């Protein structure tokens, strides 16, 4: 197993310092620190550009874009790429849609084994796996499906797994201001399987711990034990 760990917060850091540090971390999904601006009116224009690019790629590998089997390939690839990167067209505010509730709950909430698929930004090849996401509420909870949707939103972009893990943790921190957030992601990368080192069966594991999960060993251990526990209702 290949293991990588991404811990952005130092031990003992309080919540105020935590928020300041999170906001200062670099994010290559922004342009000069500004959010990516999406222009829905350009969808068809961008699709045509991608189709032209696919035709060039086909010609560059010695194929004929006009042969029967490839006639619709540029359109299919462009539409697939628009689907696989639709996370750029989503915002955290619209995704959550006010589904935050005052419950007074202060014990761990964990959604585990969330399937995700993303594209490596280096080779634009898929990586996929499972995400485990937990938080300890500070009187507020969010609809469980929203946690899975947050994973989906950030996965549907060009990514590296380390940044993806951190972005998910930061998003939950932003919407709930909980006592702590923990994210572990396990994935296999096609750029390591299909090309390059060509190592099928290798997995990359990344983690991001915020607040009590970073500062309290028992809390962190409880989370790690829970994601290893096999449910008995299957």
UniProtKB/Swiss-Prot annotation:
Pfam families: GTP_cyclohydroI (PF01227)
One of the record's GO cellular component terms: cytoplasm
Gene3D superfamilies referenced in this protein's UniProt entry, alphabetically: 1.10.286.10, 3.30.1130.10
Reactions catalysed: GTP + H2O = 7,8-dihydroneopterin 3'-triphosphate + formate + H(+)
Annotated Zn(2+) binding sites: 120, 123, 191
Domain of life from the UniProt record: Bacteria
Pathway: Cofactor biosynthesis; 7,8-dihydroneopterin triphosphate biosynthesis; 7,8-dihydroneopterin triphosphate from GTP: step 1/1
A GO molecular-function annotation: GTP cyclohydrolase I activity
Stored CDD domains: GTP_cyclohydro1
Record keywords: GTP-binding, Hydrolase, Metal-binding, Nucleotide-binding, One-carbon metabolism, Zinc
Any one of the GO BP annotations: tetrahydrofolate biosynthetic process
Enzyme Commission number(s) from the entry: 3.5.4.16
Leading EC class: hydrolase
Complex formation: Toroid-shaped homodecamer, composed of two pentamers of five dimers.
Similarity remark: Belongs to the GTP cyclohydrolase I family.
Protein name (Swiss-Prot/TrEMBL): GTP cyclohydrolase 1
Organism: Synechocystis sp. (strain ATCC 27184 / PCC 6803 / Kazusa)
């Amino acid at each position: 197993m290949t293991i990588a760990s991404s811990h952005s917060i130092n031990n003992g850091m309080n919540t105020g310092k935590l928020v300041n540090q999170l906001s200062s971390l670099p994010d290559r999904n922004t342009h000069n620190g500004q959010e990516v601006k999406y222009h829905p009116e350009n969808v068809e224009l961008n699709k045509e550009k991608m189709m032209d690019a696919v035709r060039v790629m086909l010609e560059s590998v010695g194929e004929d874009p006009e042969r029967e089997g490839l006639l619709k390939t540029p359109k299919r690839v462009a539409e697939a790429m628009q689907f696989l990167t639709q996370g750029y067209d989503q915002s955290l505010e619209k995704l959550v849609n006010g589904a935050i509730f005052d419950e007074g709950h202060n014990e761990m909430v964990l959604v585990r084994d969330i399937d995700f698929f993303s594209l490596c930004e280096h080779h634009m090849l898929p990586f996929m796996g499972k995400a485990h996401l937990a938080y300890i509420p500070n009187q507020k909870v969010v609809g469980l499906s929203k946690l899975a949707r947050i994973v989906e939103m950030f996965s549907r972009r060009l990514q590296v797994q380390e940044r993806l893990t951190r972005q998910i943790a930061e998003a939950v921190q932003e919407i709930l201001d909980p006592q702590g957030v923990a994210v572990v992601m396990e994935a296999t990368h096609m750029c390591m399987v299909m090309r390059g080192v060509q190592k099928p069966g290798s997995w990359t594991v990344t983690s991001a711990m915020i607040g009590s999960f970073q500062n309290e060993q028992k809390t962190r251990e409880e989370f790690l034990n829970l994601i290893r526990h096999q449910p008995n209702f299957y």
